[in-house]
Amino acid sequence: MRGRYEASQDLLGTLRKQLSDSESERRALEEQLQRLRDKTDSTMQAHEDAQREVQRLRSAKELLRREKSNLAHSLQVAQQQAKELRQERKKLQAAQEELRRQRYWLGEEQEDAVQDGVRVRRELERSHRQLEQLEGKRSVLAKELVEVREALSRATLQRDMLQAEKAEVAEALTKAEGRGGLPAGLPVQAERPQREPCSGQVGSEPPCHPGHSWRKKSAPCRAGSGRRSRRPQWHGKSRSGWRRCGWNRRWRGRAWRAPYERRSRPRRQWSSSSPRCIMSAAGCRSS
């Protein structure tokens, strides 16, 4: 019995030892299980974190893709703008070169304009001087014109007087011829076969003016001793009854010839290119 008891005690001690070992092993397994659970939790947390990170990375990737697309578009736009800017720069360079040339030509034109202004000023001064000279000549010509008009009026008056005298002489001759003879106061040598007309020349005496010939060419001038008298001959008591010959005819020719020559003489004409007066029969005119 004692042996069985000791064996039971040994077996109980062995069982207790095994129970103790099993308890230790169980606690170790629980600890290991807890560690595994913690590790699993951490792994799950890491997995969730990894999934969230993957999602974030996907979002970032999509964002980067969109940004890349935007950057590519911006790069294309920038390249297009750079190309346009290069073209604009070329145009600006060409415009700058053109402006430089225009500035050069404008400088040349400015110098030419200054020279033209000086030349025009000189021409204007010369024109003013010419105008003053022309004014002086015009005043002189106006005075000459007044003198010519006065001479013409005097000549016209003399012509009217001569025509009246010629009419009176013709009337007296007509009355004398109607009475059958000439008056006693007209010492005309009718018996001479050859008569000298008033338009003839004797020696160096000038002829009568062609526009103022005597009324009757057959009526001779009174001649004495083969030469013309230098004094006018009076026929009758009336002044209108005497006939002019010799000296008076020469005076008459000069009185009428001066206006005629003045009218027929060519006058001067001014040209625009030269201050000299050009002679022309039409008269002096300013061109």
Swiss-Prot record:
Q: Which UniProt keywords apply?
A: Coiled coil
**Which residue intervals make up region (Disordered)?**
176-243
Where do Basic residues bias regions lie?
Answer: 212-243
Q: Out of the domains of life, which is the source? A: Eukaryota
- Coiled-coil positions are 9-179
| Family note | Belongs to the rootletin family.
Question: What protein name does the entry list?
Answer: Putative ciliary rootlet coiled-coil protein-like 2 protein
Organism, as annotated: Homo sapiens
